[in-house]
């Protein structure tokens, strides 16, 4: 498996589905998706559970908020990919996001971390 995409989640019901769907829509499909729910009290855990039928999807359910770093480390421990991509629960990936990250990562063996370009959008404003 080429990549593991890791999404830590805490009360992300307003964004999580769009975030996950943007990952499934990637041009690069050799990846697994790992969502770590950190004790959410909104509907985001139910959203996360709705993807459990996909064999490339893994869900870790924490009964309480163990912190962002711990959740990320749980995802890394489960990951089987050659590369790991951390993705926020309120982010949206363009269809070629993972493909371009992997191309860049493989272009130079000295690269140890890569950050894509990002745009900050305010909900409802279009800017």
Report residues per predicted region:
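Glycine-rich, basic loop-to-helix element that forms the pyrophosphate-binding segment
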Residues: 62-79, 89
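Cell-envelope/extracellular polymer assembly enzymes that use nucleotide-activated donors
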Residues: 2-4, 32
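Conserved donor NDP-sugar-binding/catalytic core segment of glycosyltransferases
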Residues: 96-127
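Short, well-formed alpha-helical segments that are part of the catalytic scaffolds
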Residues: 12-25
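Acidic donor-binding segment of Leloir-type glycosyltransferases
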Residues: 22-61
């Amino acid at each position: 498996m080429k990549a593991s995409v890791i999404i830590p989640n805490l009360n992300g019901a307003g964004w999580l589905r769009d975030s996950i769907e943007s990952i499934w829509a990637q041009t690069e499909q050799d990846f697994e998706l790992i969502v770590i729910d950190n004790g959410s009290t909104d509907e985001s855990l139910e959203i996360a559970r709705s993807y459990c039928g996909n064999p490339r999807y893994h869900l870790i359910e924490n009964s309480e908020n163990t912190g962002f770093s711990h959740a990320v480390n749980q995802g890394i421990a489960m990951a089987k990919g050659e590369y790991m991509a951390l993705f926020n629960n309120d982010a949206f990936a363009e269809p070629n996001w993972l493909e371009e990250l992997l191309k860049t990562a493989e272009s130079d063996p000295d690269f140890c971390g890569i950050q894509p370009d990002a745009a900050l959008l305010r909900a409802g404003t279009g800017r």
